[in-house]
């Protein structure tokens, strides 16, 4: 029989949620942690994301504030436009809105590498083990035995004895599939998304996030996400194009790293020119284009069983409409670590974690759906009516998200 490695916590997935969990556990004095990542190598992949002030507060508390400030852009405003670039409504964000911490736009891969470096420095170089995907687990008399399969070495199985398993393994979570085999269906919004990164001259004040819509609910979201580019008077723009009613094939893997093609998205935005931003040029000069459908899942009635639980997208996949996915994973991570640090009974701690985090994240999944529906519904209204409607939509959304904060 193969001897199992002894540890306290096994985390499946070395994404933003999994790595933040490891750091938060370390801050609680829990240092015997193993993070299993299915990729053979962790590289700074992906495009830009937003991290909301409540999550930034937790990353600052973990000692990452200086590194984040040197990497991302502190967003100052959210600006809604029509497809000709005319401003309909603006909302201050982060510090400009009176929050004690900024909202940051940051390259997902750079944030992941920042977290990875901190984990290796604080918990040890061997904490994150790559090329291992969790396959199965079973509860034992005193803990949980986790089995992972190596991607190389003939697919050998490696086992771990732990007190808890945290499934932070994302959209296609193996831990979720084991816990909830009948609750893994992806629900499409009938919106296709294309994403990319393009270096351009700074627009507006260099800290603005724009959301532009036409009367068919075709949408562009764009914002700068790199402090390094800003230091040289340039902007690395993360852009997202969202087109409704595009035929979707969910038999093709729904994943954030699937390649897309310019010819499929450019026709929808061919005449979108704002004077200060040429959208066709923005798309055409992108260093990469990713394509995937906008999907979520219905909230689960419970996340975990016994000593196994879920976190982030594995627990509560949500539309990106509210820019809250990464933020909620970070808040999950801190809440989980707090409960495990405060409670010697692991099962009870996981139950308390779920009791704290499942209700607000369930509410945000629904709020993102409602916001998407509401914003598309006003697309054909006259511009003056849109202004009041947008103010009401964002105010309602903020009131729900604010209740998700970790105390």
UniProtKB/Swiss-Prot annotation:
GO terms for biological process: phenazine biosynthetic process. Signal peptide: none annotated. InterPro entries: FAD-bd, FAD-dep_Monooxygenase_BioMet, FAD/NAD-bd_sf. Coiled coil: none annotated. It catalyses: phenazine-1,6-dicarboxylate + NADH + O2 + 2 H(+) = 6-hydroxyphenazine-1-carboxylate + CO2 + NAD(+) + H2O; 6-hydroxyphenazine-1-carboxylate + NADH + O2 + 2 H(+) = 1,6-dihydroxyphenazine + CO2 + NAD(+) + H2O; phenazine-1-carboxylate + NADH + O2 + 2 H(+) = 1-hydroxyphenazine + CO2 + NAD(+) + H2O. Disruption phenotype: No antibacterial activity toward E.coli or B.subtilis. Its EC number is 1.14.13.-, 1.14.13.218. One of its GO terms (molecular function) is FAD binding. Gene3D superfamilies: 3.30.9.30, FAD/NAD(P)-binding domain. Its cofactor is FAD. This is Phenazine 1,6-dicarboxylic acid hydroxylase PhzS.
């Amino acid at each position: 029989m193969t001897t199992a490695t002894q540890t306290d916590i096994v985390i499946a997935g070395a994404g933003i949620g999994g790595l933040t969990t490891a750091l938060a556990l370390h801050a609680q004095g829990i240092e015997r942690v193993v993070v299993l990542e299915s990729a053979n190598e962790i590289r700074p992949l992906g495009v830009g994301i937003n991290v909301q002030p409540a999550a930034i507060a937790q990353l600052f508390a973990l000692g990452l504030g200086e590194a984040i400030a040197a990497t991302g852009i502190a967003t100052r405003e959210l600006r809604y436009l029509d497809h000709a670039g005319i401003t309909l409504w603006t909302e201050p964000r982060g510090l400009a809105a009176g929050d004690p911490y900024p909202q940051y736009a940051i390259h997902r891969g750079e944030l992941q590498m920042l977290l990875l470096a901190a984990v290796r420095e604080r918990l040890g170089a061997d904490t994150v083990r790559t090329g291992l995907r969790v396959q199965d687990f079973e509860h034992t008399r005193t803990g949980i035995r986790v089995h992972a399969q190596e991607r190389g070495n003939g697919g050998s199985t490696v086992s771990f004895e732990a007190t808890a398993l945290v499934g932070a393994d994302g959209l296609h979570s193996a831990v979720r599939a084991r816990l909830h085999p009948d609750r893994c269906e992806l629900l499409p919004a009938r919106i296709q998304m294309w994403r990319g990164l393009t270096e351009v001259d700074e627009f507006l004040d260099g800290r603005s996030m724009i959301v532009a819509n036409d009367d068919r609910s075709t949408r562009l979201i764009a914002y700068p996400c790199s402090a390094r580019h800003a230091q040289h008077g340039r902007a690395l723009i993360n852009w997202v194009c969202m087109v409704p009613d595009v035929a979707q094939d969910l038999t093709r893997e729904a994943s954030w790293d699937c390649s897309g093609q310019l010819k499929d998205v450019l026709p929808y935005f061919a005449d979108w020119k704002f004077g200060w931003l040429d959208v066709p040029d923005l798309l055409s000069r992108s260093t990469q284009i990713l394509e995937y459908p906008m999907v979520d899942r219905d909230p689960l009635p419970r996340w975990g069983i016994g000593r196994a639980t879920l976190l982030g997208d594995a627990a509560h996949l949500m539309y990106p409409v509210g820019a809250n996915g990464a933020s909620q994973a970070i808040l999950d991570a801190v809440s989980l670590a707090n409960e495990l640090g405060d409670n010697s009974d692991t099962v009870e701690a996981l139950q308390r974690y779920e009791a704290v985090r499942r209700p607000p994240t369930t509410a945000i999944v629904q709020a993102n759906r409602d916001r998407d529906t509401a914003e598309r519904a006003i697309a054909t209204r006259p511009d003056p009516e849109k202004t009041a409607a947008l103010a009401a939509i964002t105010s309602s959304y903020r009131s729900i998200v604010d209740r998700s904060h970790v105390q």
